[in-house]
Regions:
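Extracytoplasmic
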Residues: 1-186
Length: 186
């Protein structure tokens, strides 16, 4: 019987889907940025979210609270994690802002009309835990890089996957997008 008490896992490593794009809309914990207005406004990093009249305490704490994706690794092996601030289609550096998009005629304010806020990212990392053991990997970010990639070997099983960016002021914010590819074939 369906229930919200049971976490739904996103499968990684299935032969039918060797590449999976995870979006912050599916974060567990805190208040996930569930639309493009929130992504553009850097929800999870900013101390104030001007897009809402009342700010939930969770919004401020999100970056430190450890938002994650619940994933299930189907096949063990080496996986590549590509962390992004902006979607692939935007093709913008991790640290860049985005201009506001054009209005949509005949509609209320479109999400794309919100300017994309830059986040001063200096490094990126991945935390992954299988509820017993944790793995942590962190790398520096190039100023003009649209993404950062890192690889980890994983065994089949259930995990909490928490890719993140670290800012020059020492704050962390979850990676808004994470493209997982794998496992590598020999």
């Amino acid at each position: 019987e369906p229930t919200f008490l049971q976490t739904t896992e996103i499968y990684l490593g299935a032969p039918e889907a060797p590449r999976v794009t995870l979006t912050c809309h599916d974060w567990i914990g805190g208040t996930p940025p569930w639309n493009q207005h929130m992504v553009r406004a850097a929800l999870g990093y900013r101390q104030k979210n001007s897009g809402r009249k009342k700010q939930a305490v969770e919004d401020v704490k999100q970056a430190a609270s450890g938002s994650f994706w619940a994933v299930k690794v189907v096949e063990g092996g080496k996986y590549t994690f590509e962390l992004r601030r902006w979607p692939t289609e935007a093709n913008k550096p991790l640290v860049s802002s985005l201009p506001a998009g054009a209005a949509v005629p005949g509609s209320s304010k479109a999400f794309r009309e919100t300017p994309g806020e830059a986040i001063p990212i200096v490094s990126a990392g991945v935390r992954i835990t299988d509820y017993v053991n944790s793995t942590f990997h962190k790398v520096l970010v190039g100023k003009d890089s649209p993404s950062v990639r890192m690889s980890l070997s994983l065994q089949p099983g259930s995990y909490e996957l928490a890719p993140f960016f670290e800012t020059k002021d020492g704050k962390e914010v979850g990676a808004y997008y994470c493209i997982v590819t794998g496992p590598e074939q020999p």
